[in-house]
């Protein structure tokens, strides 16, 4: 078990692999199932993990995109994400990591303020997406978006790289933290 690096493994031919990290097993599995239903030109592989580090395995494929799923109803979810981030190499944050906050629709039940997750994403210079994964329609839409982002991060979209995508996502964000 060690730091997860983007170039530890060779890429698979026409394969795109996403790692979903989060404490909500059922929601992660539902999101993974929705992603696998999506139309994808490449072979899509979805791996789930409660936390990092991953056990070192010779058979584990190269990870093209890591999505940290933070449930805003659980402080443990945020703590788990913060601890897992320590096991990710800095070069992964060049467009191959994003945060997904779920549960924002019922703010009265949230134990984590949205601003906390915004600061976390800003600290790691990574995009932050919001989606209520408990709603099937929202989950299906998020699955589509994640599959598209994964294809870009895996290098399967000509003319667009993970860094290009990162700069596009950052420029479409709202005001910076300093402006708030």
Swiss-Prot record:
This protein is called what? Centromere protein M
Name the organs or tissues of expression: Isoform 3 is highly expressed in spleen, and intermediately in heart, prostate and ovary. Isoform 3 is highly expressed in resting CD19 B-cells and B-lineage chronic lymphocytic leukemia (B-CLL) cells and weakly expressed in activated B-cells. Isoform 1 is selectively expressed in activated CD19 cells and weakly in resting CD19 B-cells.
What keywords are assigned to this protein? Centromere, Chromosome, Cytoplasm, Kinetochore, Nucleus
Give the CC-aspect GO terms. cytosol; inner kinetochore; nucleoplasm; nucleus
Q: Where is the protein situated, by its record's location annotation?
A: Nucleus; Cytoplasm; Chromosome, Centromere, Kinetochore
Q: Does the keyword Transit peptide apply?
A: no
Q: What does this protein do?
A: Component of the CENPA-NAC (nucleosome-associated) complex, a complex that plays a central role in assembly of kinetochore proteins, mitotic progression and chromosome segregation. The CENPA-NAC complex recruits the CENPA-CAD (nucleosome distal) complex and may be involved in incorporation of newly synthesized CENPA into centromeres.
Q: Identify the main location.
A: nucleus
**Which N-terminal stretch is annotated as signal sequence?**
none
Which Gene3D superfamilies does the record associate with it? P-loop containing nucleotide triphosphate hydrolases
**Description of how the protein assembles with itself and partners:** Component of the CENPA-NAC complex, at least composed of CENPA, CENPC, CENPH, CENPM, CENPN, CENPT and CENPU. The CENPA-NAC complex interacts with the CENPA-CAD complex, composed of CENPI, CENPK, CENPL, CENPO, CENPP, CENPQ, CENPR and CENPS.
GO terms, biological process = chromosome segregation
Pfam families from the UniProt entry: CENP-M
């Amino acid at each position: 078990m060690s730091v997860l690096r983007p170039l530890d493994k060779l890429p698979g031919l026409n394969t795109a692999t996403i790692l979903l990290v989060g404490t909500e097993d059922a929601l992660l599995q539902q999101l993974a199932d929705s992603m696998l239903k999506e139309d994808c030109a490449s072979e899509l592989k979805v791996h789930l993990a409660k936390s990092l580090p991953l056990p070192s395995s010779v058979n584990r494929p190269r990870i093209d995109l890591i999505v940290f799923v933070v449930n805003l109803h659980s402080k443990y979810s945020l703590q788990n994400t913060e601890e897992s981030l320590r096991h990710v190499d800095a070069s992964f944050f060049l467009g191959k990591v994003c945060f997904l906050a779920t549960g924002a629709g019922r703010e009265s039940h949230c134990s984590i303020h949205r601003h906390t997750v915004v600061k976390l994403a800003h600290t790691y210079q990574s995009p932050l997406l919001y989606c209520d994964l408990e709603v099937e329609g929202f989950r299906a839409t998020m699955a589509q978006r994640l599959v598209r982002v994964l294809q870009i991060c895996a290098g399967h979209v000509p003319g667009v790289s993970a860094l290009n995508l990162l700069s596009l996502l950052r420029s479409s964000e709202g005001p910076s933290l300093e402006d708030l």
